[in-house]
Amino acid sequence: MSSSRPRLHVRLHYEGATRPSLILEAGSLNVLDLSERGLRYRQEFGPEPALGAKLEGILRLTSGETLPVRGTVVRVMRPAKPEDASVIEVAAHLTDVGIPSRVILSERKALQEPPAH
């Protein structure tokens, strides 16, 4: 399903092992994608967050930099694969403070660089 509205912010998609982490009270979770005003993460344990639930934690970027994040859960999805039945993906809109554009640009550059050998 596509939206007729263009995205306001660049969204970075993380694949493979190099991903930012979202550190919440319940533990550290893998970030799947990130923009200045939102993020999506993978949760493999714990209770499913309710839509509208508040989210507060620390985002640890691939560079090692950490940023406080606060937001609201806007979507909860289950992967289509039956073997991943306990896994959920959670999307959150960042409310108070977003991710600075300099961080998004730095992360995008890091994603485009080939890994060091």
Please name every model-derived segment.
Residues 32, 80-117:
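C-terminal output/interaction extensions
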Residues 10, 47-51, 63-65, 84-88:
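A generic structural micro-feature
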Residues 9, 15, 38, 54-56, ...:
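Broad gene-expression machinery/nucleic-acid interaction feature
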Residues 29, 69-76:
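Short beta-strand-centered aromatic/proline hotspots
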Residues 27, 41-42, 54-57, 76:
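Short structured motifs
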Residues 33, 61, 73-75, 96:
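A residue-level detector for short acidic-glycine micro-motifs
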